[in-house]
């Protein structure tokens, strides 16, 4: 869709919404009624590429798999031509899905770069948090463009090092701040920038992790110890410091943060509980974090077990996983240290203040955001929002149902592929140059939390 068609379509949909006596269609519904492409959020600079961008996937876990899927969906834009992944099942799955020859399949990221000059256009780095900096620096040195998972790096020094290397090499480094690419946040940003609520005065933003998700990733899972990964404000919430910086439209000046681990610890282990849920735990039937319930009976979050395609074989394999991996351990008897609740206050250089809460103990997911402006306010939950104007008291609503990441994952990959294919970084909303700032807010917040200080943020 061209920019002109895009603007005309939106105007038409808005009229349609208004006519309906303020019973508003979602964009998605309206697009369906009008028989239009549902994806109204395509970047106006997108164009057909001369050839697909050739990428090497480094880290073929959960995120890497999602990004690689884009090549299956859009083979004219992206091809996965190599993979580096120590886990054999994951490596073979990607190789089979993308027809990668054995000589382009590796067990470690370093092997990708041993052959000397680049044999692809770009690399996607979706390795664990502590394994981003080294492959990114090496890729830039050899002349690859990069799509880098967030957090870009565990420390401020490494983050600045990546920025310097990207600038020196002139290569494109996109950071996976997927929220920026969601229709929901794009619409919010457009309304704010269009002055629909006057000047932004303050923001309240909450990230509800959801209690089982918390237990899976930050109590039992890879991200449970900040030393081994990154502090949770980076691992989970650098998306939020990023979205706040983006919506407010000014750099952060100061940050203050409180937060601690209050519930998921030994002192709260119920009487009768056992080291593993499969050890005959007496409270297992009523425990909200029962691994038997989550993984075995409800069959949720099973990607961590690398199960075969044939679901009839899963039962015994899941039970074996619960007896041998961290995912079967009692949530009160882990070696976790990530805070399960945290609040940060941010003062931006334009005087806007933002309050951010990261909460584990909630039954829902989906960021909640309230934006207070001089001429109106916005209240939203990532599926819908309502804008109320102080001028005429009118309320305007927007809604769209999408996947867990608000539909941002593949929209982000598309923008990055287009940026690489067209050699135009302007197509990317989250290049490293911008992303460093959001990371600096998170590093400062963690410093404040640990040292009980108010931290200055300096670019
Ligand atoms: N953008 C987002 O919204 C988002 C969401 C979740 C996670 N993440 C981030 O994405 C990254 C990956 O997370 P994930 O959930 O996919 O984790 P994961 O554990 O599923 O995947 C990481 C993969 O890297 C592989 N790996 C480890 N060492 C390697 C090496 N030396 N060479 C090559 N591969 C190696 C692992 O075997 C694993 O398969 C993390 O940094 C995480 O914080 C981002």
Language model features with spans:
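Beta-strand-loop-alpha-helix segment that lines the small-molecule cofactor/substrate pocket
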Residues: 122, 128-129, 133-180, 195
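Short amphipathic alpha-helix with an adjacent loop that forms part of the alpha/beta core around
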Residues: 109-119
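Glycine-rich, N-terminal phosphate-binding loop of Rossmann-like dinucleotide-binding domains
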Residues: 126-127, 207
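Conserved SAM-binding strand-loop segment of SAM-dependent methyltransferases
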Residues: 102-108
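C-terminal capping/lid region of NAD(P)-dependent oxidoreductase domains
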Residues: 16-19, 23-26, 30, 171, ...
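C-terminal helical cap and adjacent loop that interface with cofactors, partners, or active-site loops
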Residues: 33-40, 98, 338-459
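Predominantly a Rossmann-like dinucleotide-binding segment in NAD(P)-dependent oxidoreductases
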Residues: 179-329, 452
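N-terminal Rossmann-like dinucleotide-binding module
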Residues: 3-100
């Amino acid at each position: 869709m061209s920019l002109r068609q895009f603007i005309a379509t939106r105007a038409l949909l808005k009229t349609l919404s208004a006519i309906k006596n303020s019973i508003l269609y979602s964009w998605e519904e309206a697009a369906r009624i009008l028989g239009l492409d549902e994806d109204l959020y395509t970047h106006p600079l997108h164009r057909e590429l001369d050839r697909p961008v050739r990428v090497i996937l480094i880290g073929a876990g959960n995120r890497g798999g999602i990004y690689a899927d884009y090549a299956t969906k859009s083979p004219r834009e992206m091809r996965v031509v190599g993979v580096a992944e120590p886990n054999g099942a994951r490596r073979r799955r990607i190789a089979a899905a993308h027809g990668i020859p054995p000589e382009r399949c590796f067990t470690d990221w370093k092997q990708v770069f041993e052959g000397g000059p680049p044999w692809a256009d770009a690399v996607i780095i979706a390795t664990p948090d502590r394994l981003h900096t080294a492959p990114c620096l090496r890729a830039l040195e050899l002349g690859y463009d990069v799509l880098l998972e967030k957090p870009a790096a565990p420390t401020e020094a490494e983050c600045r090092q990546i920025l310097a290397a990207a600038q020196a090499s002139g290569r494109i480094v996109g950071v996976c701040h997927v929220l920026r690419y969601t229709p929901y946040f794009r619409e919010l940003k457009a309304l704010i920038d269009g002055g629909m609520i006057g000047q932004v005065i303050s923001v309240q933003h909450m990230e509800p992790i959801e209690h089982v998700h918390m237990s899976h990733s930050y109590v039992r899972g890879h991200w449970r110890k900040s030393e081994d990964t990154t502090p949770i404000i980076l691992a989970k919430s650098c998306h939020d410091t990023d979205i706040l910086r983006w919506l407010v439209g000014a750099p952060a000046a100061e940050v203050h943060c409180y937060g601690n681990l209050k519930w998921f610890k030994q002192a709260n282990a119920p009487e009768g509980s056992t080291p593993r849920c499969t050890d005959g735990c007496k409270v297992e039937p009523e425990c909200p974090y029962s691994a038997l319930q989550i993984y075995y009976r409800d069959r949720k979050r099973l990607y961590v077990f690398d199960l075969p395609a044939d679901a009839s074989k899963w039962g015994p394999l899941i039970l074996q996983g619960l007896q041998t991996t961290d995912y079967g351990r009692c949530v009160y008897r882990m070696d976790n240290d990530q805070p399960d609740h945290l609040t940060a206050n941010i003062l931006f250089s334009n005087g806007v203040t933002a309050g951010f809460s990261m909460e584990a103990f909630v039954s829902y997911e989906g960021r909640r955001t309230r934006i207070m402006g001089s001429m109106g306010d916005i209240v939203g939950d990532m599926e819908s929002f309502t804008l109320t104007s102080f001028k005429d008291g009118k309320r305007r609503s927007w809604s769209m149902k999408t996947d867990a990441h608000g539909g941002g994952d593949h929209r982000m990959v598309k923008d990055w592929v287009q940026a690489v294919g067209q050699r135009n970084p302007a197509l990317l909303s989250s290049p490293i140059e911008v992303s460093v700032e959001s990371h600096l807010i998170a590093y400062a917040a963690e410093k404040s939390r640990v040292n009980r200080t108010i931290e200055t943020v300096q670019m």
